[in-house]
Design a protein with these regions (language model features):
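Catalytic core of DAGKc-family lipid kinases
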Residues: 1-77
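Short beta-strand-to-turn element immediately C-terminal to the catalytic PLP-Schiff-base lysine
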Residues: 15, 33-35, 81, 109, ...
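A generic structural signal for short beta-strands and their flanking turns/coil linkers
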Residues: 59-61, 75-77, 100-105, 139-141
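Gly/Ser/Thr-rich active-site loops/lids in small-molecule metabolic enzymes
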Residues: 38-46, 95-116
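ATP/nucleoside-binding phosphotransfer catalytic cores, i.e., glycine-rich phosphate-binding loops
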Residues: 67, 73, 98, 108-238
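Glycine-rich phosphate/pyrophosphate-binding beta-alpha loops
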Residues: 25, 29, 80-94, 159
Length: 238
């Protein structure tokens, strides 16, 4: 790579005066980043465990976002600002994001039910999240977010406490990097298994009878069972 010395000018972002290169965000992804940092152990399994444990209990916030002087109000599960197209580990939060187009891809995810969670997980892995009805997306260079109270944000997965008003902007072609032009996409076996398992879960949930769908407590129990089975399979994976 160094011998070839292929240099590209890439964009980077700044959130709350802190630079980021792939993604930053506010809401559930920032909340999980904070829990992950405090978990005492690292690794994909810890991240998935925290996500499954906290996902159904998390309370979405209401956000006022300003883009190019226009204000809009949303209740959102998360707001992700992407320079690159994924969080990492093949989880694509903004499949069309490009690190050299001079724009941030913003993905806003509305609150969703527990029955919708497996489908959202699948779509994050197979790059089809933009087709989900809970998703709003747009491009911009500058975004101002106002929430109800101060709280955690994240930059490239690292958590940080911030005020209730957060500013995010993109710096076009602000960094020069040596890149590998021969890099091939790679799907880790663990991630492949996780995606396949959630596909099985989604099929099971889609066949639940009307009585179970009407009974929230029973549905919640089944989802909890699914989560425990997922963690069991992950722990058995070499």
């Amino acid at each position: 790579v160094l011998a070839e010395c292929h240099i590209e000018e890439l964009d980077y972002g700044i959130i709350d005066q802190t630079p980021f290169f792939c993604t930053c965000g506010i809401g559930f992804d920032a909340f999980i980043s904070d829990r992950f940092a405090k978990a005492g152990k690292r690794g994909l399994l810890t991240y998935i465990e925290n996500t499954l444990k906290e996902g159904l209990k998390y309370k979405p916030d209401t956000y006022e976002i300003t883009i190019d002087g226009e204000k809009q109000v949303y209740k959102a599960f998360l707001i992700a600002c992407a320079n690159a197209n994924q969080y990492g580990n093949n989880v694509y939060i903004a499949p069309h994001a490009n690190m050299s187009d001079g724009l941030m891809d913003v993905t806003l995810m509305e609150p969703f039910s527990m029955f919708e969670a497996p489908q959202i997980a699948i779509q994050l892995f197979n790059k089809t999240i933009m087709s989900n009805s809970r998703i709003h997306s747009f491009q911009c260079r500058h975004l101002h977010i106002k929430r109800s109270s101060p709280g955690v944000i994240h930059f490239d997965g690292d958590p940080k406490e911030a005020d209730k008003e957060v500013d995010v902007r993109l710096v076009p072609k602000g960094i020069r990097m040596v890149v590998n032009t021969q890099e091939q996409p790679y799907q880790p076996p663990l991630l492949q298994m996780f995606s396949e398992f959630y596909h099985e879960v989604n099929e099971e949930i889609s066949t639940l009878g009307a009585n179970i769908r009407a009974d929230f407590l029973e549905g919640q129990r089944r989802i909890s069972t699914v989560n425990k089975e997922l963690l069991r399979k992950l722990r058995k994976k070499p």
